[in-house]
Amino acid sequence: MTIERVLSHKRAICYSGFRDGQSPDTGVFPSKEEIASDLRLLQADWEALRLYACDTHAERVLAVIEEFGFDFKVMLGAYIGAEISNPNCPWGGEHADDVLLENKRRNQDEMERAIALANRYNNIIDVVSAGNEATVDWTDHLV
């Protein structure tokens, strides 16, 4: 069986429901009601959503899809931080050792959340992408 048969083509969009004053960096995430409002608008034109991290936002999006019965598939991203400094990164890929060590711990937590969410929402999540930001040699997110 080929991957094309397993994963059919879908109209997809990257989704981030953050509004003014909301940010994963500050821990202020869109509410389920805000997410549901967005998904009502998106459902007319899109079949799949791309999420970039396994954080509270992703958990809420998946819960809303399930609770409201939205017909979306999700490509879940696991956001990976640098575990290795990269002096070739044009915008500064050098990190202190303690930062790299903390990133390694966070990366492990992120991967565990990705697995847990993929298992919990296996009827919604059809792809997990880990470390998209770490796949090029010029990144500040080397692993």
Over which residues does each language-model region extend?
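Flexible, active-site-proximal loop/turn residues at the rims of small-molecule/cofactor binding pockets
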Residues: 19, 55, 134
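Conserved residues at the C-terminal ends of beta-strands
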Residues: 16, 52, 131
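Acidic/glycine-enriched edge-of-secondary-structure segments
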Residues: 18-26, 45-47, 96-104
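Conserved, mostly hydrophobic/aromatic
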Residues: 13, 49, 128
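Catalytic domains of carbohydrate-active enzymes, especially glycoside hydrolases
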Residues: 32-57
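Substrate-binding cleft of extracellular glycoside hydrolase catalytic domains
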Residues: 61-143
